[in-house]
C-alpha cells in the first residue's frame, strides 16, 4: 500500500510540474489565459522567434502512353501504374496537376523548435465546370527538443519511408513502393548520431470508405426488396460512419545512417473484422459472394537500404512482405480479394541506381514489383481491371537543370501486369514516355 501511495504521489508531482507554474515568481508574472481550440490567433508569441516561408513547384508533364497503360484510380490521375489490356489506342496529355504550393512556419528558442507545414497539390476531382481543384497534400506540426520529436497531422508514411526518385507521380505505386501521405501521430527518438527509432499510429480519415465502390460498411436494417444483412447502397449517408476499421496502424521503424549509407527495418500492424461490401449481383463482390465477418490481421514488415557504390553512383531500394496491405500504402483495392473477402498476402520491392554524372546531369535506372500470393487472389472475378496477380515496372530517367532551379526531365517506363481473372488473356505490357518541366521556388 505504501508503494502504491508513493507511486501515486510521484505521478501527481509529475502532472503538477507539467500543468502548474514552475515557481511562485513565474506564477505572479503570468496571467491566466482562456485558450480556444478553434481559434487561429497565436497566443504564446513571446516563446521563441519564428519565420514563415512560402514555397512550391510549378510543373507540366507531357505524357505519351500506349493503350495498355492505365491508372488504377483514373479519377485521381495517379500515374500510369498498370498494363491494362490489349487495346492499342495510344494517348497523350499535358498535365499541370503535380504543381505544389506550401507554407512553412518555424519557431525556436534555441532549446525547443516548432515546424508547421501546410501543402497542396492539384489532384482533387474537377468541379462542374471542369476546373482543376486543389487538394490537401501535407498538414502537420512537428515539435522537437533535444533528441526527440513529435509529429502530428498529415505527413508522408513514416514506416518504409524510402522512395525512388522517378518523375512519375505514382512514385512506383502498385509497383513495389509503399507510400502515402496520411494522418498520423509519430514519436521519433535519436539514440545517438547514427541510430533513430520511431513509434507511430496512422490511418486514413475515412478508412475503406475512401475506395468508392469497393468499400465495406456494416450491415444495417434492410430496406424493402433487399436481403437482411446487406450493406447499404453506395449513396447511403451513413457509409462514412459505418467503416468496419476502428484501429489505426501501429508501426515502428529503426534506421541506421553513417557515411551516406542507410539501413532501416519497419513493421506495422492493425486488426479489424471485415464487413460486407455494397451488394451487387451474385458472383461479384458484395452480398452475392464477398464473405464478410473475417478477422483481418493486416501486417507489414520490410527493410530499406541506401549504399553508395562510388562517389557518383548510388544504390537504393526496399523489400517488404505483408497481408491486407491497401490504401494506406498506395495499394487501393489490393488488400482483400474482392470476390471472396480473403486477405491477400504480398511480396513487394524496388531497386534503383542513381548516377550523378556531373553537377548538371543525373541518370536513374530502376525496377519494382508487386507480387500478391496467387492462392489469395484466386477466384477474384470482379473488377478484373483492378486486382492483379503481379505487376512489374522498369524505368529510365534523365534530369538536367535548364537554369537555376528550372529543370527538364525525360522518363521511359515499361509495365507488365498479370490480372486476377479466370478466363481469357491475363498478361499485358505497355509503355509510357514523359517529358517534364518544373520550377522549384
Protein language model regions, located:
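Cleavable N-terminal export/targeting peptides
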Residues: 1-36, 224-226
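Outer-membrane beta-barrel biogenesis signature
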Residues: 25-77, 361, 400-406, 441
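Surface-exposed loop and membrane-interface regions of Gram-negative outer-membrane beta-barrel proteins
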Residues: 28-36, 70-99, 103-145, 159-173, ...
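Outer membrane beta-barrel
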Residues: 41-74, 84-209, 213, 246-262, ...
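Membrane-spanning beta-strands of outer-membrane beta-barrel proteins
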Residues: 96, 134, 180, 245-249, ...
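Transmembrane beta-strand segments that form the barrel wall of outer-membrane beta-barrel proteins
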Residues: 113-124, 203, 265-271, 362-371, ...
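Detector for outer-membrane/organellar transmembrane beta-barrel domains
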Residues: 256-392, 396
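Outer-membrane beta-barrel "beta-signal"
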Residues: 400-402, 427-441
